[in-house]
């Protein structure tokens, strides 16, 4: 296997680790889990997580890529880039702007010689409905863009849609958007397998069916989701603010994990 001496991650809440367990007030996340495992396999391993929740692809390009470029060490660096999902979720999303931005960012990062790691997004989060169809339409186009540019530059692409279980409620946080601790663990193991590192071979073993929710329980969950996530999300959109405003990256410089 290729032994990476450095892992740099760029992006939004997915890579920051929102929804995972918190340690000292910070979410752990799949990226930190991967970094800890890689550190056990490589002396003097360092990790740099620049991801911040709520960031749009243009913000990741402007704020995070210049910082990451300072620390890339060619093929010995594993470089994760996942941005654009927040753009896709916005009412005014314009794929003619966002998708080319994404491609150019990937080309710039690939030119450093680092091993790129890209991600697709879950395309189906519900069985049916107008919102599901809009979600599927937008994210399937976004994902095709990720796959195409990933193939062009020789990136490793972690395709969420090859793991249908990841969209089940057992792996999603109560906001239905972020992963829970089990979900972050699952993504970490899938990434470790993709990059040729030691991984848990049982991470994608068949799972028993989830118990059916009763009608009252389903209504309670729906009301809780609307009041704790949907209404605040709409409020932020109306006020033009982001969940990432005023936040800083977990690691402003590489940290040694071994």
Per-segment meaning from a language model:
Residues 43, 111-115, 155:
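A short helix->loop->beta-strand "cap" motif at the edges of active sites that frequently abuts
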Residues 80-82, 109-110, 116-117:
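Conserved, well-ordered alpha-helix/loop/beta-strand core segments that scaffold catalytic motifs
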Residues 126-160, 181:
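Substrate-gating cap/lid alpha-helix
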């Amino acid at each position: 296997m290729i032994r990476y001496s450095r892992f740099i991650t760029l992006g939004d809440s997915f890579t920051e680790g929102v929804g995972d367990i918190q340690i000292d007030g910070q979410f752990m996340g799949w990226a930190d889990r991967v970094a800890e495992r890689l550190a056990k396999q490589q002396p003097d391993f360092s990790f740099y997580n620049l991801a911040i929740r709520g960031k749009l692809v243009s913000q990741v390009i402007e704020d995070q890529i210049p910082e990451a470029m300072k620390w890339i060490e060619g093929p010995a660096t594993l470089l994760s880039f996942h941005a654009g999902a927040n753009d896709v979720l916005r009412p005014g999303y314009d794929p003619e702007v966002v998708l080319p931005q994404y491609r150019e960012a990937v080309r710039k990062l690939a030119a450093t010689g680092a091993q790129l790691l890209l991600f697709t997004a879950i395309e189906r989060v519900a069985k049916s409905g107008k919102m599901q169809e809009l979600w599927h339409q937008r994210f399937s186009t976004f994902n095709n863009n990720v796959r195409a540019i990933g193939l062009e530059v020789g990136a490793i692409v972690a395709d969420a849609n090859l793991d249908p279980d990841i969209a089940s409620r057992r792996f999603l946080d109560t906001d239905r958007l972020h992963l829970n601790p089990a979900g972050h663990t699952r993504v970490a193991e899938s990434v470790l397998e993709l990059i040729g590192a030691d991984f848990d071979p049982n991470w994608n073993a068949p799972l028993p069916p989830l118990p059916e929710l009763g009608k009252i329980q389903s209504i309670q969950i729906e009301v809780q989701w609307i009041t704790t996530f949907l209404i605040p999300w709409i409020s932020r959109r109306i006020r033009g603010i982001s969940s990432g405003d005023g936040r800083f990256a977990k690691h402003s410089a590489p940290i040694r994990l071994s």
